[in-house]
Amino acid sequence: MKKIEAIIRPFKLDEVKIALVNAGIVGMTVSEVRGFGRQKGQTERYRGSEYTVEFLQKLKLEIVVEDAQVDTVIDKIVAAARTGEIGDGKIFVSPVDQTIRIRTGEKNADAI
């Protein structure tokens, strides 16, 4: 099993979710996060003063899948989240040793 973590632009969430559901993914966790990278900050105005927001709002998606689904999930996220501009995000893939559904005690693939 693998855990796929994707950092995406917030307005792309619906497109990514639809693409993943259509690919058979039945669950994911979404968290609001802030960060910076090549996109840098952006200048905003507040009460007549300009200031730079260095940490930009993003969403972090966490999805645990069987190894055979990893490439499909990555392809779906990239296709749905891409704008072609700096700041589209990143995808990280990590191994998952064990998964347990707390309610039933099911483990691994049965718990996904």
UniProtKB/Swiss-Prot annotation:
InterPro entries: N-reg_PII (IPR002187), N-reg_PII-like_a/b (IPR011322), N-reg_PII/ATP_PRibTrfase_C (IPR015867), N-reg_PII_CS (IPR017918), N-reg_PII_urydylation_site (IPR002332). GO terms for biological process: regulation of nitrogen utilization. The keyword Ribonucleoprotein does not apply. The modification Phosphoserine is found at residue 49. GO terms for molecular function: ATP binding; enzyme regulator activity; identical protein binding. Phosphorylation dependent on the nitrogen source and spectral light quality. Disulfide bonds: none annotated. It comes from the Bacteria. It holds the Pfam family P-II. Keywords: Nucleotide-binding, Phosphoprotein, Transcription, Transcription regulation. Coiled coil: none annotated. One of its GO terms (cellular component) is cytosol. The modification O-UMP-tyrosine is found at residue 51. Belongs to the P(II) protein family. Homotrimer. P-II indirectly controls the transcription of the GS gene (glnA). P-II prevents NR-II-catalyzed conversion of NR-I to NR-I-phosphate, the transcriptional activator of glnA. When P-II is phosphorylated, these events are reversed. In nitrogen-limiting conditions, when the ratio of Gln to 2-ketoglutarate decreases, P-II is phosphorylated which allows the deadenylation of glutamine synthetase (GS), thus activating the enzyme. This is Nitrogen regulatory protein P-II. It comes from Synechococcus elongatus (strain ATCC 33912 / PCC 7942 / FACHB-805). The gene is glnB.
